[in-house]
Regions:
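Short, charged, surface-exposed loops that flank catalytic or proteolytic processing sites
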Residues: 101-110
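Retroviral integrase
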Residues: 1-97, 120-144
């Protein structure tokens, strides 16, 4: 987890270390409360992680954030201020996203193009399925 600024806007970014999936949310403030709200939205979609790594920023070192992590059963680890590479996945994602934002006027289109291109899966599960993609999309399964 990290926060970064681009053109006067503050973004909350998270990276799943296993899949390298990136999630970004625009924040109105850099408070622990706004970070917790963004994290809760993320967790409601992807589940609660076992471990969260962040820097020692004020929003992550605040008592409110520590209480949130404890309540949700999250081990919160911080990277060393002198060694930010300890949170390298997020730092690399920040550089990538900033580069995309520079190339596109609409930040949402930039982020969408990043997700569509960089996270395509080459394996097609439909090839192994006897059901059509339409029946799978509609959650309808024929009787056997």
């Amino acid at each position: 987890m990290d926060l970064f600024e681009y053109e006067g806007r503050t973004y909350f970014i998270t990276v799943d270390y296993y899949s390298r999936w990136v999630e970004i949310k625009l924040l109105t403030t850099q408070t622990a409360k706004s970070v917790i709200t963004a994290a809760k939205e993320l967790f409601s979609t992807h589940g609660i992680p076992d471990i969260v790594i962040s820097d020692n920023g004020p929003c992550f070192s605040a008592l409110l954030f520590k209480e949130f992590a404890a309540k949700y059963g999250i081990l919160h680890t911080t990277s060393s201020p002198r060694y930010p590479r300890a949170n390298g996945e997020v730092e690399r994602a920040v550089r990538t996203v900033k580069g995309l934002l520079k190339k596109n006027d609409d930040p949402y289109l930039a982020l969408l193009s990043y997700k569509l291109v960089s996270h395509q899966v080459s394996y097609s599960w439909e090839e192994d399925s006897e059901l059509s993609s339409l029946s799978l999309q509609r959650h309808w399964h024929p009787e056997t």
